Amino acid sequence: MNMHVDMGRALTVRDWPALEALAKTMPADAGARAMTDDDLRAAGVDRRVPEQKLGAAIDEFASLRLPDRIDGRFVDGRRANLTVFDDARVAVRGHARAQRNLLERLETELLGGTLDTAGDEGGIQPDPILQGLVDVIGQGKSDIDAYATIVEGLTKYFQSVADVMSKLQDYISAKDDKNMKIDGGKIKALIQQVIDHLPTMQLPKGADIARWRKELGDAVSISDSGVVTINPDKLIKMRDSLPPDGTVWDTARYQAWNTAFSGQKDNIQNDVQTLVEKYSHQNSNFDNLVKVLSGAISTLTDTAKSYLQI
């Protein structure tokens, strides 16, 4: 099938499998000077950086543990290195900025040059594919902004929970060789602070709310105006499982509580990990989109120049 037609159909409906296939074959097409992975990295768009930083944040969160009594011996919990989460947010923000800059470069340098060639030098009508490229680029910018905002917000939330889990070490201790003391009231207050200050995110104007609700699932809720709010249910379960200050539990009861409490922490981790996987998929889609866009613009520019030479 004509590559022109393939590109037009894939770009118009944002058919990601088709775009991926085109991105793989386009560099071999003599008429399409598509960007390569090396070109993307040279432009500062290297998806490996934010994804590695987010992976490090997930690993750091997973390594957190509460104090426990094992074989009659009290074992301290493990605190988090919170700077790992800051690093992840900075990487996500920087990657989004590089992605947006690249799209704007395509829009101003490549797409603008194509329009000038087609329109100013003879008044021919641009290819129908060209007419939709600006809209495709605009939608790409919107998706970048939305994902960066949401991933940054979820990472901040992740960090807040990690901070609480670290501070729990200060309120759980061994009463004696058979019992554990837990100041649950103080821990409740810490969790409530997280609930009261959950980050909210705003989707870009004109975002497809239904699509984003389906994309993000029940880890968040999205209002009709595009405000994204983190679902606090898991934190509420953690908070409500806690006893009053000064409570003493035997080892068996404490370990049962610890298992349930840590299970909710793991559920939060799963929510964030799922979003990070979707973010990774979105980055892959972006790379393929840019490769196809650059190839399409290159092809259309050559077509317009050939027309003018007739």
From Swiss-Prot:
NCBIfam families: SipD_IpaD_SspD (TIGR02553). It is found in: Secreted. This is Translocator protein BipD. Gene3D superfamilies: IpaD-like (1.20.1710.10). Required for invasion of epithelial cells, as well as for survival within host cells, escape from endocytic vesicles and subsequent actin-tail formation. Probably regulates the secretion of effectors BipB and BipC and their final integration into the target cell membrane. It holds the Pfam family T3SS_TC. Belongs to the invasin protein D family. Human meliodoisis patients have detectable antibody response to BipD. However, BipD does not act as a protective antigen. The keyword Nucleotide-binding does not apply. The N-terminal domain is an intra-molecular chaperone that prevents premature oligomerization of the residues on the coiled-coil region that are involved in interactions with the needle and/or itself. The residues in the C-terminal domain probably form oligomeric structures at the tip of the needle that are responsible for the regulation of secretion of other effectors. Residues 127-171, 250-299 form a coiled coil. InterPro entries: BipD-like_sf, IpaD/BipD/SipD. The keyword Calcium does not apply. It comes from Burkholderia pseudomallei (strain K96243). One of its GO terms (cellular component) is extracellular region. Keywords: Coiled coil, Secreted, Virulence.
